[in-house]
């Protein structure tokens, strides 16, 4: 089975187009650096991608990097350790981007500017 490839946006503004090329229509702009996308196919210097909201389009390869970020698909708690009995450090809102440091079974260690802790893996999109 082919492994999923996840990349993230390199800049605060990235165009998602209806085809591979600068002359193609911009469907919408992704306005967040570190926004995770899944690669569906590759054509020359372009990737066809899908995001967690199932929006598809083409992004130039120069606009994406391989850095482990995930986006929360639902609101969930961030814990000090990878179990629900440990201290709750924060509450991550839905659609929140977190840097993924590592994952163990059902948990991922994450960080953002305010907290480093553990969140349930099933709450994140952008990692298998």
What kind of region is each of these model predictions?
Residues 1-20, 29-33, 40-80, 87-96, ...:
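SH3-family beta-barrel domains
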């Amino acid at each position: 089975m082919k492994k999923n490839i996840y990349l993230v946006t390199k800049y605060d503004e990235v165009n998602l187009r209806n085809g591979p090329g600068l002359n193609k229509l911009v469907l919408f702009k992704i306005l967040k650096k570190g926004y995770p996308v899944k690669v569906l196919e590759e054509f020359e210097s372009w990737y066809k991608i899908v995001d967690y909201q199932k929006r598809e389009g083409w992004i130039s390869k120069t606009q994406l990097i391989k850095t482990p970020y995930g986006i929360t698909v639902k609101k969930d708690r961030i814990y000090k350790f990878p179990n629900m009995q440990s201290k709750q450090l924060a509450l991550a809102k839905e659609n929140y981007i977190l840097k993924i440091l590592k994952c163990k079974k059902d948990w991922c260690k994450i960080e953002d500017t305010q907290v480093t802790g553990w969140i349930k893996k099933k709450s994140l999109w952008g990692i298998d």
